[in-house]
């Protein structure tokens, strides 16, 4: 794996922190590999090593890029619930995830905690200004809630 991908304590899941905007609370994190909560409790490692540090810096809007997320094996929703509760008015969005991952998110009842689906699939996200991308996602969520 290229050195730009950070080891986050998971055997098969790696991440890149692409963008953080502290004053507005945005973070963009790109994922690579296989997210496996069933065997390795990847969410616990990811939450404790990455997300908690960002929350401590008042980040409450997380855009997770899933273009390179190959698979997801869910287990319990405890850490997703905890993450969601800790960000109050923020959000967690998984963008550009594969159909089988969307189905697994649904099977694990994660729709209560995270946003995902076709409305968050943006092919040309890499060419967009990161702050504008986050603001665009925020607008979609705001309109969905109303």
Feature names for model-found ranges:
Residues 1-22, 26-68, 72-146:
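Amphipathic, Lys/Arg-enriched alpha-helical "gate/interface" segment within cytosolic domains
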